[in-house]
Amino acid sequence: MKKIFVAAVIILFAAAYAVGNYFVDFALERGEDLSPPKACANIADPTLKPPPVPNFPAEDWSLESFDGLKLHAKKFSPAEKNNRWAILVHGYGRDGTYAYDYAEEYLKRGWNVLVPDLRAAGRSEGKFITMGALESRDVFDWAKKISAENPDAKIILHGVSMGAATVLMTAALEPKNLCAVVEDCGYTSAYEMFSAQLKKIFGLPEYPVMPCANIVCKIKTGVKISDAAPLEVVDKIKVPVLFIHGDEDKLVPFEMLDKLFDKATAPKEKFVVEGAGHADAKRKNPAAYFDKVFNFLEGCS
């Protein structure tokens, strides 16, 4: 009887690991030839291509992450030298090239721009995406590098989707010279977001998939999916935050906007783009989008 019980427990744990491992490999593991995770095929718009490279002087930057990964970023310089810096952070399954249209707008207005490839994306090393849990530490290090290069820098963080979650968590770490944050369609937590979308997007039930995936993610990456939780730290941010969300977002539920906004204690503004889906606020109305962003950032000039 005891042997049967032990065997049953082993089978149960093996099954739980297999379930969690399937999700982590499907949703978080980088594909072959630097491609995004397999799950991106279920989420990403296949017609969306990287915008043109901004027509401004550019150079490659690199740094080593706290856990030994070589990370890459593209640094663009405006026409006139100044102390204003924008770190633009891409979303899930993308790389820094997808932020080049945002970079163009900042550069035209005289900002220095740094566009990182987050870990496990683009030219940066890494096997797994962690939905902002570790990426936020990497962006913190990019901000630290900027401050070392330019001690008088005024740095803003602007992120979209997973990039938005990342910049919120980065801001809570209080990088030196941080001036403001723009978050566009960020989630309260990756765990909550995946749970809400699991059946619709991946055809999987929340239970037992998410609890098992949380454990396997911890084993494989050192952090849990639930560690990517901006809602838990947004009240620690001390600089002004602009919260942006499209009211037709089907991926990151629209109600997450108010949860984040209400929890924030720093000076804050909210910008809802009617009719915009996920990560589509800028494309829906570019003029209104960037007018709002740069009016908000006037205090960092």
PLM features: residue spans?
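The serine-hydrolase catalytic nucleophile loop
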Residues: 92-105, 118
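Hydrolase active-site cap/lid region
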Residues: 169-223
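Conserved alpha/beta-hydrolase
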Residues: 105-125
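Alpha/beta-hydrolase active-site loop
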Residues: 129-150
